Amino acid sequence: MSDLTKKKLQIGLIVDSDSIDRWQFDAVANCSDIVEINTIIYCQNSQSKKNLLKHVLYYLLNLLSIRNRQTTQVAWSKLTSTSSQIVKFNCQQTGNWQTIDVTTQEKLAEKNLDLFVKFGMNLLRDPNLLRAKYGVLSFHHGDPMKFRGRPAGFYELKQHADEIGAVVQELSNHLDAGQMRAFGKYQICAHSYRRTLEALYANSASLLRQAILNCLDEQTLNIVPTGKNYRLPTNFSVVHFSLLMIIRKVKRLFFGLFQHRQWQIAQAEHLNFAIEKAKTEILLLKTLPIPRGVGFIADPFVLPNGEVICEATTKNSQRGFLMTIDNAENSRIKTSILGKNHLSFPFVVKHADRLLVMPEMAANGSQVICELNQSFEITKVHSLQGLENERLIDPVLLFRDLKWWLFADKSGNEADHLFLWSSENIYGPYVAHRMNPIVVDPSRARNAGAFFNINNEIFRLGQDNRHDYGDGITVCRVTQLNDLAYDEAPVTRLMIAGHKGPHTVSTNGSKTYVDYYDKKFSPIAWLARVKAQF
């Protein structure tokens, strides 16, 4: 791998106006420590042909949904320095393909750039003639194995796809046939095209950095573009799409007003992931009774003595607190020292003969880890150095190769982004992994419990949040974990017949607990959601 501290890569930015989209601006800004914009390649005559009669309703949909906060225009000049140069040219156009003239190509060749990033123009003919060490990188929003072409997100929503993909590839003369440098999967907001696209554009911006790092590491992804090449939708297709969105919005409104998730915890059979299979059905042995006065219990973690520490709520509330449960009694843990807001996901770990709990507490502030006494009372609170400015979701620790590895999501994109930090001391200082986010996939990004060690293999559990929240767990075998890289491979999907879930799994070796939920009708379900806002 190249030493990123030596010299920044010199890049050329291909544009066709004085501004670029907000998400494009953020993508480049996120790489400011490893790249420098040497040259702006400015096409002055780029045009797209439009068939207004055939696609008039699509262009109306564009105004209402596709244009959003992430497509707001930002001047690219804010990314340049005083030494940046601008090369203006007029492209040659044949159909949807555009070509950069030979004179401009020769000017750019003299600059010996490391790579080009394309944010403007249509399809670029002969990108290989723009001589750069790592070629021309370009975004495509859509999974090339399923949905090629355009518009981004439309057909995924229309066909109720599991997720929407995005890729950064090195361009060639054939559609989606260049080397794939970075790829991610993102959650679909089934009832809103605008929200789907805003999240897609905002979250996919991180792919540019990963693509550049993979260029430096000479890494490519084995992705074959076998998906259907879609075109702009007809007016009839837009009408059908709009009706689907209306129906889904009505269903979502009904759920918000009159339905809630009734979470429960159950003891389950022992799990073994040694044999790979598409789905593993969990057998529930005994469901724990919900304590009196409690609305639901979820997020179970098994304590050394076999008791369960979990999240609980009062009735008609969504604000979680921590509770221990055993067959004899239940006890609410005093957590006022951590704040008055939501607490959940109480990950537990033993360290230096001390029992520690690290709950999800993003609503209260930066992450801490707490010492528990034999009565499971908090006796001491430790801040995690290096994470003071982060708001972590469902954090989990793993000790491996003389290091503590902290896996967590961040508030805002917790459904499909997993981040990693490491430290030689459990209390920090923690350093962010160079390939963050290390997982971009709504089927497994968000943690679903502690790591499993089976036959000296490490397995990570990730929530499946593609459609319903916490509806199943994807088990992943960790295949690579070091300061330079992280990789994992899905092994199986855990499910519970007749219920939604599991959402969290925990074991102490002898006992295994899971949580699950059913959707229940309640005429005052809306009340808990209103109270959660205050």
Please place each PLM-identified region on the residue numbering.
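Beta-propeller fold detector
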Residues: L284-K286, R332-I337, T379-Q385, V431-P437, ...
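Structural signature of eukaryotic scaffold interfaces centered on beta-propeller domains
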Residues: F296-L303, F347-H351, I393-R400, A450-N453, ...
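Short loop/turn segments immediately following beta-strands, especially the blade-tip
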Residues: N373-F376, S423-G428, R477-Y486
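Conserved blade-ending motifs and adjacent loop-strand segments that build the rim/top face
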Residues: R434-A450, A485-V505
